[in-house]
Structure formats: structure tokens, C-alpha cells
């Protein structure tokens, strides 16, 4: 084995020279230079400074403007709530531990940080699944004239939390475990060992199949069908130009969210899968640190995409920030094509 395994940690560094210490007790400066830990802390500070205001603003603007409280926006707000969980439950902890060079909060703190990071990522993934299904059902109409209403949105939000908890909670109760990863300043699922005492192998397989592969299959199926249907509807001119434009804009926004999710999380998932399938292989702490910390940037991109691509929300946000007056002078009529409401695009 090219790493050192302890009772509640795995350090990707051989202890032949006897320098390895528990990441809960002493700085891990034998893994990387102190300035590299400082860079991680600076990065986490940046994510907190950007992530909290933009996600809080998303929630606040929606509460302030009744016109934004549409069923589809419930799912988008769910993403903002998940991102805030990551900011407060994960990023603040990782900032502090990076400044100290090791996970100063011990195994209990590691469990909490790993839980919130996993929970936030899984809520985001399952929210994208719900959005994909909503777009598919509304645009492709496999169930005739289905209308995505408030009750459906609430059920979708509840579903995302149930599925996210089904992934994030088991390591807290004995099925797998959370341990420090990479440079040992943040925690995640144990992909490094089989750890039969906590049935780690079965959990990792369960996680990759149920909480990554299946959601990706559903998302790609829905959008594959959706793109075909929208093209057919446009070719046959079955709906007005305004309706088609509205549907294209909403669909484009959600697809971009999926693309950015993959950009942020696919490197982490790929590295984790490689480590799990190559037990004991030689890899450095940076190998897992970079994708793990890059994945944390997902807390920023969803609200940014929403603000940039949804004109109605952007106008409401500017009105809120400018004390009731939109400096651009855009009214609601100009934002009609960007409203995230139910679709009227007919099937092909």
C-alpha cells in the first residue's frame, strides 16, 4: 500500500519514514507546502464571499417578488438552499482547517463537513433530475396536457431531499464513513479503502450506481427527447414564436446548468472512481484535492446562470438592489419570453 491507513483516516503518503501523523491531530505539511494550504484557504474564502451573497439574493428576490414564485422556480430555489448548506456547513469549516494545515475539528467535525458537502452536491444533482423530468413531461407531453403545478414542485423538492439524504446520511450511521481527503483539510466519502467493518465497498458501488449513473441516464434521456421534440415543433410551426422562444430559453438555461454540473463534479467522480478501483495505487494528495475543491465551486454557478439567462428574475433583482427602480427600464412585458412557467409546446 502506498498510503497510510488509520482507524478513521487514510493519508496518501507512505509511512516508511515515520512522518505520517493523524490528520485530526497535527499539520500535514509533509503532504504539501504551507503556502499551498494557504491557497486552499484563500480559495474557500472566495467561495464564501461569492457563494453566500448570490444564493441569499436569489432567495430574497424571489420572496420579495410574487411573480417569481412559480412552480418551476421552487426547484431552482431548492438549489440555492442546497448551496447555502454547502457554504455554511462545509466551506467555513474547510477554510478554518486549511489555515491550520489539518482537520482540527476531529472525526465528528469531519462527519458534519462531509455530510453537508455530500448533501449539497446530491440535492443539486437530484434537482437537475427533477428539472429534466419537468422539461420532458411538459414539452414532450408523454402524458397529454400535463401541467406542472405547485404540488408537483413541492413533491419534486421533497424527492430531492429524500434522495440526497439517502446518499449523505448512511456514512453517519455505519454504512461507509467520512474521512479527510486529499490534503486532509476537507472530508468526503471513503473511496480509498474497502473497510469491511463498515461495508464500504457496497456503499461506494451503491453511490456510483444510484446517485450518479442513474441520474445521469435520466437527465440525458430527457434532454435527448426534448431537443428532438422542440425541433419538430419549430419545423411544423405548431406554436407561436413567443411560446417557442420561451421554451427554448428555459430549456437552454437548465441544460447549461447540467453542463456546468458535469464540469464541476465529473472530474471529482472520475478521480474517486479511479482511486476506488485501484486500491493501494500510488497517487499524491493533490490528485484528489484539486477536483474536490473544484467541485465546491458548484455553489456559485447555478444562481449566476439563473440571473444571466432569466430576464424576469434579472429585472426583479435589479429592482430590489436599486430600491424599487430598475435602472435598465425593462418592464415585465419585455421579460415575458423568459418566464419560467409551464410549457405549451405541443408534441411532435
Swiss-Prot record:
GO biological process: absorption of visible light; cellular response to light stimulus; detection of light stimulus; detection of temperature stimulus involved in thermoception; G protein-coupled opsin signaling pathway; gene expression; microtubule cytoskeleton organization; photoreceptor cell maintenance
Lineage: superkingdom: Eukaryota
Sites of Phosphothreonine modification: 336, 340, 342
Cytoplasmic side: 62-73, 134-152, 225-252, 309-348
Knockout-associated phenotype: Mice show no response in electroretinograms at low light intensity. They fail to form rod outer segments leading to degeneration of photoreceptor cells within 3 months of birth.
Keyword Cell membrane: no
Modification sites for Phosphoserine: 334, 338, 343
Alphabetical list of Gene3D superfamilies matching this protein: Rhodopsin 7-helix transmembrane proteins
Feature type site, description Plays an important role in the conformation switch to the active conformation: 113
Subunit structure: Homodimer. May form a complex composed of RHO, GRK1 and RCVRN in a Ca(2+)-dependent manner; RCVRN prevents the interaction between GRK1 and RHO. Interacts with GRK1. Interacts (phosphorylated form) with SAG. Interacts with GNAT1. Interacts with GNAT3. SAG and G-proteins compete for a common binding site. Interacts with PRCD; the interaction promotes PRCD stability. Forms a complex with ASAP1 and ARF4. Forms a complex with ASAP1, RAB11A, Rabin8/RAB3IP, ARF4 and RAB11FIP3; the complex regulates Golgi-to-cilia rhodopsin/RHO transport in photoreceptors.
Function according to Swiss-Prot or TrEMBL: Photoreceptor required for image-forming vision at low light intensity. Required for photoreceptor cell viability after birth. Light-induced isomerization of 11-cis to all-trans retinal triggers a conformational change that activates signaling via G-proteins. Subsequent receptor phosphorylation mediates displacement of the bound G-protein alpha subunit by the arrestin SAG and terminates signaling.
Record protein name field: Rhodopsin
Originating species: Mus musculus
